[in-house]
């Protein structure tokens, strides 16, 4: 009996190691061929104890159901990844909205270094190189017929960074928002200069300023980012006081390098 246990365990867990598909809403699925280019975007997930790189992948073709997925598998080597995209996954339940077939591929918590990527679909492969440093992820890839990277470089959020926005409904509230930003510095927040680029959660333009979201929904908005190493509860308390005093007039968001 002992001779059969390990092979049986291997057979059970092998699909879990290498096969992945979309988060579909039903187990009743059909599959169809991938017939358009796959666009790939780098994204880093932040948490208090680690940082995880993901690839967000979507077909160039737009479908009538937003919940179509992409079936794929990944084989990871010491410094390499082979990613094979198999097919578009069609659920029997359609969430009616236009969108690409998509999937999210977990690359993991990667050490600094260089990684070779092999991207395969419909029997053809394209090669790319991923360079990981403490400051960024960079992709070296010549766009081909089957794959395209939307962001060839993803800057990494520095330690102790906080950032966000203050949206407000009337220009007369500008002084209140400025007071909030000044109060952050009284609490210990220090101005920080970041190089231009895409940080995933925000972008910095060539002048070093934080770019407001394209569709932020406020008549007026101010962006901010600081180095902050003191008690985060003090910032939460400051935000709460202002938003309680100016209900439905000022909306403040705040995010941290630990994913809060």
PLM feature spans:
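Short acidic/polar inter-strand loop motif in beta-rich domains
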Residues: 89-94, 120-129
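Ligand-binding face of N-terminal immunoglobulin V-set domains in extracellular IgSF glycoproteins
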Residues: 98-112
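A eukaryote-biased signal for long
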Residues: 173-260
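Acidic/polar, low-complexity intrinsically disordered N-terminal segments immediately downstream
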Residues: 22-86, 141-165
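A short tyrosine-centered beta-strand micro-motif
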Residues: 110-122
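Short, cysteine-centered beta-strand-loop-beta hairpins and adjacent loop/turn segments enriched
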Residues: 63-65, 89-99
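Bacterial Sec-dependent N-terminal signal peptides
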Residues: 1-6, 11-39, 260
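Surface-exposed beta-loop interaction hotspot
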Residues: 125-184
């Amino acid at each position: 009996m002992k001779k059969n246990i390990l092979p049986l365990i291997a057979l059970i867990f092998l699909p879990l190691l290498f096969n992945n598909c979309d988060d579909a809403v039903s187990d009743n699925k059909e599959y169809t061929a991938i017939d358009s280019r796959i666009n790939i975007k780098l994204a880093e997930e932040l948490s208090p104890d680690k940082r995880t790189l993901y690839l967000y992948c979507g077909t160039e073709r737009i479908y009538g159901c937003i919940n179509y997925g992409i079936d794929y598998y990944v084989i990871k080597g010491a410094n390499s990844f082979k990613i094979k995209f198999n097919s578009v996954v069609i659920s029997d339940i359609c969430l009616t909205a236009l969108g690409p077939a998509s999937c999210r591929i977990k690359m993991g918590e990667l050490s600094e270094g260089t990684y070779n990527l092999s991207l395969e679909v419909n029997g053809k492969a394209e090669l790319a190189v991923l360079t990981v440093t403490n400051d960024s992820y960079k992709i070296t890839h010549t766009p081909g017929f089957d794959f395209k990277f939307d962001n060839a470089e993803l800057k990494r959020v520095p330690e102790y960074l906080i950032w966000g926005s203050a949206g407000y409904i009337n220009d007369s509230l500008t002084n209140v928002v400025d007071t909030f930003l000044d109060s952050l510095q009284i609490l210990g927040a220090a101005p920080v200069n970041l190089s231009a680029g895409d940080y995933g959660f925000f972008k910095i333009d060539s002048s070093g300023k934080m770019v407001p979201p394209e569709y932020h929904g406020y008549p007026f908005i101010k962006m901010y980012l600081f180095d902050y190493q003191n008690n985060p509860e003090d910032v939460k308390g400051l935000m709460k006081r202002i938003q309680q005093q100016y209900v439905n007039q000022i909306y403040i968001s705040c995010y941290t390098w630990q994913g809060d």
